[in-house]
Regions:
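AMP-forming adenylation/ATP pyrophosphatase catalytic core
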Residues: 1-142
Length: 142
């Protein structure tokens, strides 16, 4: 049993209550139990505050992903920007992007915004059929 908490809209206004933030996944629409007049999706969670932020599907899209705990496979290290394809979800088609070295990992900038890249999930980088490496997503930006 998890402690109940608040559903918030993007402005921070309470729009409902939930049965524990841990039960919800970024991008989730079903099972929220909210009737707000338009479909809403889980756009963020604050585990410390036990809040779940909801909003329109457009809020789920981000272009920039930061990753740490990187494991390079086909290259010894990333020393300069590199054009790659990348995935942030298991069944996702590879997406065009540029990867940049960053402190403790890499910054990945997709050519097109991606739906719900999620901290804690993997970002895997490819060049053709070769897996360059990957890391754990730590944060995302528009």
């Amino acid at each position: 049993h998890y402690p109940a908490g608040d559903f918030l809209d993007r402005s921070g206004k309470v729009v409902g209550t939930h049965s524990g933030a841990v039960r919800y996944t970024l991008g989730q629409r079903k099972g929220l139990g909210l009737a707000l007049g338009a479909p809403v999706y889980v756009c963020g969670k604050d585990m410390q505050a036990n809040t779940v932020t909801v909003g329109p599907e457009s809020e789920l899209f981000d272009r920039i992903v930061y990753a740490e705990d990187v494991n390079w496979i086909a290259i010894p290290a990333l020393t300069e920007p590199l054009r790659v394809t990348a995935r942030t979800r298991y069944h996702q088609a590879e997406q065009q992007a540029t990867v940049y070295p960053a402190e403790n990992g890499f910054r990945l900038e997709f050519d097109q915004p991606q739906r719900a890249p999620t901290p804690g999930q993997a970002a895997v980088l490819y060049q053709g059929d070769v897996v360059l490496g990957g890391g754990t997503i730590t944060r995302v930006e528009k």
